[in-house]
Amino acid sequence: MRIKIKDILISSKDVKFVGNIKNIERVVSFYSLDSREIKDDNINDSLYFAYKGNKVDGFSFVKYLIDLGVKCFACSREHESECIKYLNDNEGLVFLLTSNVIKLLQALASFLIEKTSFKRIAITGSNGKTTTKEMLYSILSKKYKTYKTWGNLNSDIGLPLSILRVEGNEEYAVFEVGVSYVGEMDLLSQILKPEIVIITNISYAHMQAFKELQAIAFEKSKIIGKNIEIFVVNEMNDYCVYLEKRAKIANPNVKIVYFDFENLSIKSFSFLDGKFSFDFVYKGFEYSILLLGRHNIFNAIGCINLALFLGMREKEIKEGLIETAFQKGRAEILTKNGYLILNDSYNGNMGSFMALKNMILDLNIQNKKFIVLGSFKELGELAYKTHKDLIQEAISMNFDKIFLIGEEFLDVRDSENLVEKCLYYFSEFDKFIDFFLKSLEPSVFIVIKGSRFNRLERILNIFR
């Protein structure tokens, strides 16, 4: 969205303008915390947030960006003297000084969202957020001008950045919302103020922070605020009734839309030359998704019911589903150098692993099967049990070789004496990859699964 510097000053009480007063009328429309995102086509319109992270201090790139041609910066007050020095050499610069760069980003997003007229849709849940977002965006785009969160900008930093990147003239905006610590959803809900909320499911994820499922359900439910008009909920989830009550407390007139599976019939699954299609009939109309996994049909039904409620026709919905562009690393089927590869390396929790198990059963692979499992993170006290369960589930799936990467798996091996001949343990990726290369056999089916932390997509490099 386009905004004048003078309006940014209104968005927060904790911001100080440093620059020539005439530049207060300057307009910005591209917002970034990553200097690499600033290119020739957005230099003149950029506002760079010089955020100090755990590894990199964004202020260290300010001089480089000034030389590149960027004019506007949000910086910590501790850098005021340096900013003034830069300003003495270039009076066209604007510095917005604040005690907390990220809080300024969040305040600006909250301020600007109030200026928009589009319907704000929030999608959250333990699994399926990104896939559901992509499907709903593709469907709505068949009839309405629609925006979506790009990538997985869904956190206390990513969501406000995603909000700032809308054009402002959309009819619907679909935002993915994720949490990794207690209280994060309070903040995200206050920033976004969604009118339509979809909760895909409640299952084990981020257990280090939340300890138990009830705590996850409570945290996720905080996305439901007083602005809610429509609530879409999976009626198969154990917390459906609880979430529905929360929605009705927030707004007694809220419209409830269910993931209703009574009228669902899975017609066929086809897999040919690395391409697949799930065909199903729902409420008498035939749909298809080009994505592996029956659980994705369930998420598609949530999107279908919401789209129908919003006045879309079945034909439009069908076209939107079939045209959905899905992200890499999420149930992605690849054929490389004669190998069939199922790459599900982006997300690691027990719920997504069980969904993966069903995908593999649907594929009905007759060739030899290898699986590479990277350890799952943020499990807290459940880490040991989860990794033990993972090993046992993998064994039950009759893989010919199971490659396990991470100290968590080694702990289970040593305590449980799990040393079956199909199991191969490695403390880290670098110790695994050479052994894996030597283990490959022609035409083997390879499954890759792990947390984003593991960066298991690096395996794909050996097939190029």
Swiss-Prot record:
One of its GO terms (biological process) is peptidoglycan biosynthetic process. Keywords: ATP-binding, Cell cycle, Cell division, Cell shape, Cell wall biogenesis/degradation, Cytoplasm, Ligase, Nucleotide-binding, Peptidoglycan synthesis. It is found in: Cytoplasm. It is an enzyme of class 6 (ligase). Its EC number is 6.3.2.10. It catalyses: D-alanyl-D-alanine + UDP-N-acetyl-alpha-D-muramoyl-L-alanyl-gamma-D-glutamyl-meso-2,6-diaminopimelate + ATP = UDP-N-acetyl-alpha-D-muramoyl-L-alanyl-gamma-D-glutamyl-meso-2,6-diaminopimeloyl-D-alanyl-D-alanine + ADP + phosphate + H(+). Pathway: Cell wall biogenesis; peptidoglycan biosynthesis. ATP binds at G125, S126, N127, G128, K129, T130, T131. Its main location: cytoplasm. Disulfide bonds: none annotated. It comes from the Bacteria. One of its GO terms (cellular component) is cytoplasm. InterPro entries: Mur-like_cat_sf (IPR036565), Mur_ligase_C (IPR004101), Mur_ligase_C_dom_sf (IPR036615), Mur_ligase_cen (IPR013221), Mur_ligase_N (IPR000713), MurCDEF_CellWall_CoF430Synth (IPR051046), MurE/MurF_N (IPR035911), UDP-N-AcMur_synth (IPR005863). GO terms for molecular function: ATP binding; UDP-N-acetylmuramoyl-tripeptide-D-alanyl-D-alanine ligase activity; UDP-N-acetylmuramoylalanyl-D-glutamyl-2,6-diaminopimelate-D-alanyl-D-alanine ligase activity. Pfam families: Mur_ligase (PF01225), Mur_ligase_C (PF02875), Mur_ligase_M (PF08245). Belongs to the MurCDEF family. MurF subfamily. Involved in cell wall formation. Catalyzes the final step in the synthesis of UDP-N-acetylmuramoyl-pentapeptide, the precursor of murein. This is UDP-N-acetylmuramoyl-tripeptide--D-alanyl-D-alanine ligase. It comes from Borreliella burgdorferi (strain ATCC 35210 / DSM 4680 / CIP 102532 / B31). The gene is murF.
